[in-house]
């Protein structure tokens, strides 16, 4: 397929997403099933266009003075893929599969409208109703934070030191253009792509199949490391999901101690068994029911709550959820988080730790949840992570890190990671 066919496909998929309110992955999969002739490189280019449109939805609609899928796609190709209008015209001229060109008025808008004149939430590509949350949390840098969430994300890998060291893994993966992560001691990074370029499918690499690494954002690696630094021998991963942090904790404990993994949504835990086997882990105990946890109250030195959340910190990778999030959804999530914190606290032994993590950068899901929990549970208090951060990473090397009341916030703008909130609470006798 040439560019014209890829543009036409992206427009078709965006219409499907809008009409049927589908997740982006479902629409891409459905299109691929009905267009089997499309090669892997074509599918990657089409996926890039669709993701870029949803990342920059508001700003693209503003400069084109139109939010129809055709205009949005052309805006991304010209502005973000850096293909000028005249060059694109020549590329599409003889392509039989090219869609109709935008109206002259739309192209005129593209050349005349200046994004700096747009309302700030449009410049930041975030829903207008969330602007106040960003402003209250990040103050003068809120717009930079918002803009950073509309960029492409790199591909981060976590070395599994149970099987290999980072130096050896780096040598085996150097042909992918990897480099060392800037913060995580176990991380390797493949930089974000531009235009039609795609990230490599590293899961096909023999080193992945041998269990030498896991795909894990650097931010997730960092919060896992901060969780493990307490040297707890008994850890409960209360919202284990697919097991990303469970596996990281097992590695950080060098396969010693015991990690219990549980999740209220059993389907989310489906991948964990195969991942545990591939990683060579044998200190993880899986729980399939709430009843199996009941006898373990006040048993754990650390309880990790990687709480279900809005996912605002992952917008670079999942831009469609940005536009599906509503005030009602956020309220429902915060109520769920309150319940989970209360449920998980009963498993923390005296002088133990309750670690609260979200992949959100909204205060409603983060520090406000902590303050609410502490108001109901005075036998817990915030245990500052500043000294531990300095021990692991040296705060002087990361002066922009956002630390509030001893808790930390990671963001694409501050740490070049996904957005995360980390808070460690200590239970007192």
Please provide the spans of the model-predicted regions:
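S-adenosylmethionine
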Residues: 1-429
